[in-house]
Amino acid sequence: MVLGGAFQGQNVMETVGKGIVITDPVVYAATNGADPPSAIKDYFPDGRLPDQAILIALVSAGLFVTLATYSRFPVSTSQAIVGGVAGVGVGASHFDFSFLQTTVLLRIAGSWIISPILAMLLAFGLYWLLGILLRRARAVAWSNVLRASVMVSAAYVSFSLGTNDVGNAIGPLINRFPDRIPELALLGGLAIAFGALTFGRRVTHTVGREITPLDYSGALAAQVSAALGVHVFSLLGIPVSTSQAVVGAVVGVGLTKGAQSVGGRKVVSIAVSWVITPVSSAAFACGAYRLVTG
């Protein structure tokens, strides 16, 4: 997790930190085909998000992710922070939506739909292939290999999570500390690892048991598929959700056994939380910023 953020998290950091809200007059003119309002220098001093906006975006995202985690919902840090940054951008510009990078936001939103579907399809195919191979192999020998493979794939999931979620968590801070990206990545990775160890068990139970039962080969297929999908999007600088990818992959494994083996109600409730999270985070961040700054 820490290594993923430190070595390959910069693309997502740049997108979250500087690619969602337009704070530069030149970028505004190029994006909107018109000169920016004269108040842009008041909205975004020094051509960046104000410090209050950065803090409120982070607090808003952290609040919604914490509440969801406590409620056992695997929501997306990516969605929460993107919503938070967009919200403070709208609040800082006095509700002028032209300061949002609409094209970037649409691309991000599209990736939130594609990512779990891609992971689901990959997991479905990989689990089906593993099933064929296991039927032709000695059970005892393959059991040991699968156990080791699950541990390795779990490490890959953590690495991929770091490449994306660390960038999400600290992306807004590069507005304030553009020369401290390695240190911020290390801090973000350590903080996420600490949160996973101390507060992640509730969500782990939901994903691992309440969607569909997983054996070793199912866990391997789900982990590899989710990690691969997230890693690709991270390299492209698109903030997607590891949670969404993992849930999609677990559903893919379940579908190989038939639709009845997937907890439909739980999947629907999780999907609803994915819609609520960015909207709520954006609304809260926007309102909080206007309240704080008047």
Where are these regions (language model features)?
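Multi-pass alpha-helical transmembrane bundle typical of ion/small-solute transporters
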Residues: 1-294
